[in-house]
Every structure is written in C-alpha cells, then in structure tokens.
Curated annotation (Swiss-Prot):
Binding site for NAD(+): 49, 202-207, 226, 231, 272, 295-297, 322, 372
Subcellular location as annotated: Cytoplasm
Cofactor note: Binds 2 Zn(2+) ions per subunit.
Keyword Metal-binding among record annotations: yes
GO biological process: formaldehyde catabolic process
Binding locations of Zn(2+) 1: C47, T49, H69, C177
Native source species: Oryza sativa subsp. japonica (Rice)
GO MF annotation, one: zinc ion binding
PANTHER family, alphabetized: ALCOHOL DEHYDROGENASE (PTHR43880), ALCOHOL DEHYDROGENASE 1 (PTHR43880:SF9)
Name used for this protein in its record: Alcohol dehydrogenase 1
Pfam families with a match to the protein in the record: ADH_N (PF08240), ADH_zinc_N (PF00107)
Family: Belongs to the zinc-containing alcohol dehydrogenase family.
Length: 379
C-alpha cells in the first residue's frame, strides 16, 4: 500500500486521564518495526477490561493511552521478518499472543505465551520499548498490545490472528476477547458430556458465551446464576434452561444447586471473579466427576478457601485463560464455527455506534445495558 513505511495520521480516541471521557484526536502512527504489523481497524467493541483500566482500577495506571482490544481489521503493512501476514489480510487483534517459539507455545496444553502474555502495565512495544502513537512528538501509550480505539494501530505479529476474509468483521470482531474466553472455558476446559447439567455463575457477556458453549456441547440443563434477575430472559437465548438468584434463598447457593440436581451439577463455569462465587462454583459440582472452571479475575487480595475433602471426594477445580485458545492457531477455527452457523455471534451484539460517539459505549456499559456495542470506525 502507498502508506507502507510512512507515518500515518489518523483519528484515535485518546484517554488523557482516568475515568474522563475519551477525546477523538489526530494521532501519528509510526510504521511497524521488525515482527510488527500495522492494521487498519474497521470495527471495534468495548469490553469490561477496557473500562476497568480506564477507571485506573488496574495495577499501574498509564496515561495518555489508547484503549481497545476487541476488533477486526485489515493489514496495512508489515515490518521486517513478518512472513505469515501480508497487506490486505483480514485479522483479529488479540490482547494475548502466540510467539510459536516458547515452551508454552510449543506445548499442546498451554496458550500462555512467555513473550506475549497479557501485560496491562506496559504501554510500549516490546521490540524497542517505544510507543508507535504520538501527538506533536509526545508519546500516547498502548494498551495490552492492541490499542484498537484508533483508525490504525501497530501490534506484534504474535497478537494478530489471520481469519477467513469472507467473515463479516462487524460480527466476528467480538470473538477476539470475551466471547471466546467464555466459549472456550466450557468447550475446551469444562468439556461437558452430552446431556449433562452445567451451572454458569454470572450472566454478563463472558457468562452468556459460556452458556452458549454448553448449548453447543449438548448439555441438557444449563442453570444461570446471577444477582440480577433482569438478565434471565436474555440468557434463555444462549441456552440457559433455568435460573437461580442467590438473593431469593436463605441457604448457600451450592446447597440450592445440590437439591435441584440430585447432589450437584456435572460442570460449573464461574465468570464473575467474586471470590464467594468461585468457592460456590467449586462446591456445587457433584462428587466423583464434577468439574469447576474459574474464568473471572478475582480481587488481588482474595483467598480461595474450601475443605480439602471437596478435592478428595473427586471434584476437580480448573482455571482458564482466554478459553485455552491459542490466538493465532485457534481463533480462525472459532470464526469458522460462526461461518458454519454453529455459533450465533449476532445474539451478543446489542448496540452499534459511530467512532465519534465512542463514549456512548462506555455509558451503556456503566448502565449495564446490552452485551456488546460495536464501534464503527468509518461512518
């Protein structure tokens, strides 16, 4: 492309300080360096993780910053050493990477790349420790290696998944984070047998994706647990067959579930990060074969406490990161699930706004309205 090797001027939504509305600014985006890719973002969506770090609730607040990590785009140019991507390729950026060289990437059992594992503190590229974004010569920092709230962004090649060019980017862009995380937690980690009973704790986007995974796997009962009863009707679209609101009961949730299921559920997936819900999700699975999977990220000081007999009685507790999907290897296959109409992505998309109204997406998330809001970069 004519812009290859040159600085591109484009619009980006800059967070100048914590919890203040994003400002659409003209930024300069430097060309990709070795093992980097510059991508034209066409559609992006807002994830709770963006909001969490924008509010500076994360470890080390870094500002000014360009947030965004769920997106779909087209490769504009590639840096030296990039061989498996070319200008024009359709891609999904991913907040975690796959270098294909480290012990984790070479293991069939792990997706936690040593080189490109998520780092929320780092606001620069790993190659040279510099940002590719600037305004008047001053750096604007990156977020989780993606920064998709910009018309153009630069990423390490390991954080870019090449997908089927026929897949509509305005739909599959939501697969680059939360939806795949929930889906994979059920399909790849919990692995519910056909006809089994699955409990889903938390019915936000990730929990609904976990329910969708249970539906695809053929679970016969999918029990949604949430403190917000307003979420129950929507959750039926994702396969939930019944619901428990802990506020409606004067006994522990694990006891309620045991009574509903003749001793416990076969599988549970915890998507809230609330430490009590995590313990409940483990203690509600059936002895002998029950498996609980933790997806939600807990408070840094949280401690998981349960009696060791819960393990000795053959219950299994697992954790998962990004649904155990390797970004570059596996994400194209998740897109194909959508293309084959096995995965219904449209159900997750409840709102759409032009880039100029990106702050509306933040407002919707704060109000708890909808599931995913697509932000259209070109009006």
């Amino acid at each position: 492309m004519a812009t290859a090797g040159k600085v591109i001027k484009c619009k980006a939504a800059v967070a100048w300080e914590a919890a203040k509305p994003l400002v659409i600014e003209e930024v300069e985006v430097a060309p990709p360096q070795a093992m980097e890719v510059r991508v034209k973002i066409l559609f992006t969506s807002l994830c709770h993780t963006d909001v969490y770090f924008w509010e500076a609730k994360g470890q080390t607040p870094v500002f000014p910053r360009i947030f965004g990590h769920e997106a779909g785009g087209i490769v504009e140019s590639v840096g030296e050493g990039v061989t498996d991507l070319a200008p024009g390729d359709h891609v999904l950026p991913v907040f975690t990477g796959e270098c294909k060289e480290c012990a984790h990437c070479k293991s069939a059992e792990s997706n936690m790349c040593d080189l490109l594992r998520i780092n929320t503190d780092r606001g620069v590229m790993i190659g040279d420790g510099k940002s590719r974004f600037s305004i008047n010569g001053k750096p604007i920092y990156h977020f989780v290696g993606t920064s998709t709230f910009s018309e153009y962004t630069v990423m390490h090649v390991g954080c870019v998944a090449k997908i089927n060019p026929a897949a509509p980017l305005d739909k599959v862009c939501v697969l680059s984070c939360g939806i795949s995380t929930g889906l994979g937690a059920t399909i790849n980690v919990a692995k519910p047998p056909k006809g089994s009973t699955v409990a889903i704790f938390g019915l936000g986007a990730v929990g609904l994706a976990a329910a969708e995974g249970a539906r695809i796997a053929g679970a016969s009962r999918i029990i949604g647990i949430d403190l917000n009863a307003n979420r129950f009707e929507e959750a039926r679209k994702f396969g939930c067959t019944e619901f428990v609101n802990p506020k409606d009961h004067d006994k522990p949730v694990q006891q309620v579930l045991a009574e509903m299921t003749n001793g416990g559920v076969d599988r549970s997936v915890e998507c809230t990060g609330n430490i009590n819900a995590m313990i409940q999700a483990f203690e509600c699975v059936h002895d002998g074969w029950g498996v609980a999977v933790l997806v939600g990220v807990p408070h840094k000081d949280a401690e998981f406490k349960t009696h060791p007999m819960n393990f000795l009685n053959e219950r299994t507790l697992k954790g998962t990161f990004f649904g155990n999907y390797k970004p570059r290897t596996d994400l194209p296959n998740v897109v194909e699930l959508y293309m084959k109409k096995e995965l219904e992505v449209e159900k997750f998309i409840t709102h759409s706004v032009p880039f100029s109204e990106i702050n509306t997406a933040f407002d919707l998330m704060h109000k708890g309205e909808g599931i995913r809001c697509i932000i259209r970069m070109e009006n």
